[in-house]
Amino acid sequence: MAWMAASSRIRPAGLRRLPGVLLLAVLVLAGAVLAGTGCSAGSRPAASTAPRAPAVAAAARPGPAGRYLALGDSIAFGYRPPQVRPAPDYYDPADFTGYPEDVGRALGLSVVNAACPGETSASMINTRAPSNGCERNAADGPGYRPSLPLHVSYPGSQLGYAVGYLQQHPDTRLVTIGIGGNDLFRCQELTDHCRGAVLSQTLAATTANLDLILATLRGQAGYQHTLVVVGYYAVNYRDLPFVHQIEALNAALAGPAARYGATVADMFSAFRAASAGHGDDTCTAGLTFALPGGCDLHPTARGQQLMASVVERAIAPVTAW
């Protein structure tokens, strides 16, 4: 969800996000970290400016079971907010690991993680479409990708990269896609509570975009192996208005998944069950980050591990590699 980060405004039940000030906070933090090395945020040492992410043609060697391409937003990216300790190194994408890396290790797959914090279902298709902080933030300022490195570098859209990657790597055996959370957050940011007809219109667009994304992966990219649509969880399951929005989002994702033979990884039920003994609060359960003033919606290492286990269970009946 921006799937990106947190703002100074506390959302219902402690839900926090940071569409407009995330990048500023991240760059200030990065500058503070670099101050001890005599460098500014804009003058990273030469040894660290070399591209870390491979191009499509130079992707990692396949693991024993093949390749795994992860697509999505900040959750798949493994984003951690700047307030956590130890502070993340935003100039080093290897400092961020999410459920894709856990899944890859468990299944013996080499992972290429193309996720971008703040990606929406529209910006995944077209970089000029509104994002929630990947290319641009909600205030139309520069986003994450123009300013900080992703796990893998690519010039166009995330979907465009996926098509090229899958065409060049037919030994790819797993693709996961977690997208749509930032569609909901943009709706919350730009409208009054994102409900009723406005919510329905937002989710209809999400469904249409995911339809196009999955059709492109199956058609143009020619990918016919295991495909997983990763659902979303609630932060606090006692916050019924937000719970209902997440349920509606997951329902919007389920239709395209079924149409294109994708398995759905049910994060909503998994996080609800795991937080049941903690007041139905994922933050109290240690699944999302507890920050001063509220709960950040991004998963902790424990939360990412839970997500990985849900993905692994979801694909167990359909994997054949």
Model regions and ranges:
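Secretory targeting and sorting signals
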Residues: 2-51
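Structural recognition of the beta-strand scaffold that forms the well-ordered cores
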Residues: 67-72, 76-78, 110-115, 173-178, ...
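Oxyanion-hole/transition-state-stabilizing segment in secreted/luminal serine hydrolases
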Residues: 77-81, 129, 133-201
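Active-site segments of SGNH/GDSL-like serine hydrolases
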Residues: 181-182, 191, 213-248, 269
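Catalytic His-Asp segment of secreted/periplasmic serine-dependent ester chemistry enzymes
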Residues: 232-321
